[in-house]
Design a protein with these regions (language model features):
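Residue-level signature of outer-membrane beta-barrel architecture
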Residues: 18, 54-56, 66, 107-109, ...
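Signature for the C-terminal beta-barrel architecture of outer-membrane proteins
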Residues: 163-286, 291-296, 300-307, 314, ...
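Surface-exposed coil loops of outer-membrane beta-barrel proteins
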Residues: 78-95, 99-102, 112-220, 224, ...
Length: 420
């Protein structure tokens, strides 16, 4: 809505994102405590963010964001591994007050004299950066700000909305229920490749708002290698390889199944003494320009599947493929459109846990006739005036919550985004 200053020490901007979603009645043989409701629903979520930043010197900046999130989610965000709205508050009991989203120091160490142009944003105020450099960040941030980024499949403001489109569903990245953590990132960048590492805090409980400030016990490590090279002649492309390990007070599905069978009860993944277990996984993130205005992308993710889904969503394996288009193709240069197919899966121990009536922090139908959760999503974002964008879309989900006895469900979507 308002112009941003170029070559300025300061940054001041904001955004508001409203997402309206609904679904009609859909078939379901049964429902449980953490099911997507089979009855007609509608819900509207909102996220409002105020971005600030100041460049302290030629290599250091301070970035602070305030945020407010509210509204509602379909079935309070339960019943889907690939939830239809990444903006929802996953704990409806959280305060609706303004909270601190990001607060970090960003330091750049030049390792070469030549410079490259940098597109200023709320994550970096520099208008140019050394071509070869080391970037350090310390403070509060969201790991997807810097890892698993994709130019056509990462932004709920302008692109897709599904959790497992915008992020790798099998990446159980360290975060509180609002998506933020506290930690340190180190990012080495060279001409056509980069490598980054993050050490971050984990929550006390699955989907919890409180982080554990004992990094010698409870912690997460994230690694990503990025190669900026296309597979098509004279067409840009990027491949990113991700790996992570989490150490936290997480339950083990098989242990809880055995314990429940011995006791003649329903398994409960939270019913265990405090202990540290480890979860690990990896991902591949690929994008390739097909033309100047059309980009194909894909993600694959995998985790060990034996340890409790804890911080992001209940996915042990995922595959997504789609395309994103820039409106310059049809002479609407600020419009965007996209289409994607996602298939999410869970491992056998996780399947058995849900089939025996167990519930996770998102899923729990009281039983399970297992099938992959398959999702189709498409959208069209229209630039209407200045910083105002409107976007109709739709998602179709087969086997919601991995259950063949429920669904399919169709979720029409309408998004209104304002930047100022």
């Amino acid at each position: 809505m308002l112009p941003h200053f170029k070559n300025s020490r300061f940054w001041l901007s904001g955004q508001t994102n409203f997402v309206f979603q609904t679904h009609p009645d859909f078939p379901a043989l049964y429902s449980g405590p953490h099911s997507l409701s089979p009855d007609y629903e509608k819900a509207t979520s909102r996220v409002m963010t105020f971005y600030t930043g100041v460049r302290l010197n030629n290599s250091t900046e301070l970035l602070v964001d305030l945020e407010e999130a509210g509204g509602a989610a379909l079935s309070t965000g339960l019943g889907l591994a690939g939830n239809t709205d990444l903006d929802i508050v996953r704990n409806p009991l959280l305060s609706k007050n303004v909270y601190l989203g990001r607060a970090m120091i960003h330091k750049v160490f030049a390792l070469s004299k030549d410079k490259i142009e940098n597109q200023r944003s709320f994550l970096s105020l520099f208008d140019e950066l050394p071509r070869r450099r080391l970037e350090l960040r310390f403070g509060k941030f969201s790991l997807p700000d810097f890892f698993d980024v994709n130019s056509v499949g990462s932004d709920t403001h302008f692109q897709f909305l599904n959790w497992t489109t915008d992020n790798n569903g099998a990446w159980d990245y360290a975060a509180d229920t609002r998506g933020y953590t506290v930690g340190l990132t180190a990012d080495f960048e060279d001409r056509n490749w980069g490598f980054r590492f993050a050490e971050a805090l984990m929550p006390e409980v699955a989907n919890g708002i409180n982080l554990v400030y004992r990094p010698w016990q409870v912690h997460a490590e994230n690694y990503e290698y990025e190669l900026r090279r296309g597979i098509l002649p004279k067409k840009a492309g990027v491949v990113r390889l991700l790996a992570y390990t989490n150490s936290a007070n997480m339950g083990i599905y098989r242990d809880q199944i055995i314990e429940a069978e011995d006791a003649g009860t329903t398994p409960d993944i939270t019913n265990h003494p405090w202990h540290i277990t480890r979860k690990y996984g990896f991902g591949v993130n690929f994008e390739q320009n097909l033309t100047h205005n059309l980009t194909a992308f894909a993600r694959f993710g995998w985790d060990n599947g034996k340890t409790e889904s804890f911080a992001y969503t209940e996915v042990d394996q995922t595959f997504a493929e789609g395309v994103g288009a820039n409106g310059a193709w049809w002479h609407r240069k600020q419009d965007r459109a996209g289409i994607v197919f996602i298939s999410n899966a869970i491992k056998k121990d996780h399947q058995n846990y849900l089939a025996d009536g167990g519930i996770g922090f998102l899923l729990g139908d009281g039983g399970l006739n297992y099938g992959c959760e398959n999702i189709f999503e498409t959208y069209y974002t229209v630039h209407t005036w200045r910083g105002i964008y409107l976007a109709p879309g739709v998602q179709h989900i087969n086997n919601p919550g991995y259950n063949r006895d429920r669904g399919p469900v169709v979720v029409p979507t309408f998004r209104a985004h304002i930047e100022f």
